[in-house]
Curated annotation (Swiss-Prot):
Main localization category: cytoplasm
Listed HAMAP family: Pept_tRNA_hydro_bact
Name this polypeptide is given: Peptidyl-tRNA hydrolase
Gene from which the chain derives: pth
Keywords of this entry: Cytoplasm, Hydrolase, RNA-binding, tRNA-binding
Annotated family: Belongs to the PTH family.
Reactions this protein catalyses: an N-acyl-L-alpha-aminoacyl-tRNA + H2O = an N-acyl-L-amino acid + a tRNA + H(+)
GO biological process, one term: rescue of stalled ribosome
Residues reported in the UniProt entry to bind tRNA: Y15, F65, N67, N113
Subcellular localization: Cytoplasm
Quaternary organization: Monomer.
CC terms in the record's Gene Ontology section: cytoplasm
Annotated transmembrane regions: none
The keyword Protein transport belongs to this UniProt entry's keyword annotation: no
Amino acid sequence: MLHLLVGLGNPGKEYELTRHNVGFMIIDAIMHHFLFPDFKKKHNALISSGSIRSHKVILAKPYTFMNNSGTPISSIVKLYKIPLDNIIVFHDETDIDFCTIRIKKGGGNAGHNGLKSIDTLLGRDYWRIRFGIGHPSNGYDLSYHVLSQFNNLNAVNNTISNIIEHISLLFENDKSIFKNKVKDLIKYTDISS
């Protein structure tokens, strides 16, 4: 069965390593760790196909900027006939503590424009991995916060490594096992921002 792993972010050098691009960072790390071929631009996204422990996987990074992420994802889903239950979207989340991971299926988009775009074209019945980037301090502009770089990139990379270590659990029916494994590993990692 084919799975689609999507990382949300904005294309361009100026957005690399920003909080809003943590989805792209996760997909890049998965690609390198599991030796996927280089990304090719198709359907307005960067795409690579390979496998993760015998599971066929397409990795995708929409290249339409965050607010229009749904258009390329919808094209990929329709072309490859991927069921919504086999779609996992990695994205930043300001309402979650820094480097905390939450997984859920469906639900609201909490004002995240990338998710809003996907919801509009595909509905909400897909999986989301929410990567906590923390909320800005009082008086700090939210858009500046999400578009600025991480203060503690080591903690981000450690959390991404924890995700990769247990990613094959995402292809199982009970995704809470993945959540618990990653959460337990994060407890023992220095994640102060």
